[in-house]
Regions:
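Accessory terminal and edge-of-domain segments that mediate assembly/interaction
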Residues: 1-110, 116-263
């Protein structure tokens, strides 16, 4: 079946868009003057708790006025030029976050995601800056013509960011990954097929994030943190992370926040 969910000739208006929704009676009023032009999305469950633990934060939105995603949005007290929030679970939620923040005036987006590694070439704690993401998410096909890969723009910020993370002791790579939203259909056969494409891990938001940002015409970047390793054969057992993972994740989140506070 050929997927034709996006028609480049369709210039008609959305039935309702993120700005209309965020200002509707369905959602709380937001003081847009408090929303900075830069936003960092963490698609990892414990990131916001880590940020609040190690930084003095101020909440600028208790709930993002999204359609399906209601993340708390915070800034760091002494540097309110960038906001931080949970980016949602899965491509539909992340697209909602991006659309809503854009409607509130955000112009630059960074996504830090988490991948499950299924290759010998990536280890827990590695940070990868992929050139492109293999799309099996569905959302990306609504924001651009269907194609296998969604490009991850690689401006100078990646060289700078990689140098920064390496200086903080992180191992960095440029390996590509896949976005899939069917967690329990990541079979051994499917992951072997992904490996043959040169992919090293799987996550749930990247392709949708990249496609949404490109469609909206905003600056955007994405990097991914390896949270766990998948067994490479059915003879191995899947193990959820390691005892050291909490400290590894805390360091990554703090370094990721500081990168944007210093720039």
């Amino acid at each position: 079946m050929e997927i034709k969910w996006f028609n480049p000739e369709d210039k008609s208006k959305s039935v309702f868009d993120a700005k209309e929704h965020s200002k509707s009676s369905h959602r709380e009023n937001v003081d847009e003057s408090l929303v900075p032009k830069r936003a960092v999305l963490f698609c990892m469950g414990k990131a916001m708790g880590i940020i609040k633990k190690y930084f003095k934060t101020r909440t600028i939105m208790e709930k993002l006025p999204g359609f399906i995603t209601r993340s708390e949005v915070v800034v760091i007290e002494d540097n309110p030029t960038v906001c931080f929030l949970h980016g949602g679970y899965g491509a539909p939620q992340t697209a909602d976050v991006v659309e809503t923040l854009r409607a509130l005036g955000v112009e630059e987006f960074m996504l830090y995601g988490m991948i499950g590694g299924f290759s010998k070439d990536i280890q827990i704690g590695d940070v990868t800056f992929p050139n492109r993401v293999y799309a099996e998410d569905g959302v990306s096909f609504h924001y651009g013509e269907a194609k296998e890969y969604i490009e991850n723009p690689c401006p100078d910020i990646y060289s700078d960011m990689e140098e920064y993370f390496i200086s903080k002791g992180h191992n960095c790579t440029h390996d590509n990954m896949v976005t899939s939203v069917a967690v329990f259909r990541q079979t051994f056969e499917k992951e072997e097929a992904w490996r043959k494409k040169g992919l090293v891990g799987v996550e749930m938001e990247g392709a949708g994030f990249l496609a949404t940002c490109k469609f909206l015409g905003v600056k955007h970047y994405a990097a991914f943190f390896c949270s766990d390793k998948h067994p490479l054969s059915k003879d191995e057992k899947w193990v959820w992370r390691t005892e050291k993972f909490t400290k590894i994740q805390e360091k990554f989140v703090c370094d990721a926040v500081n990168y944007f506070l210093e720039r």
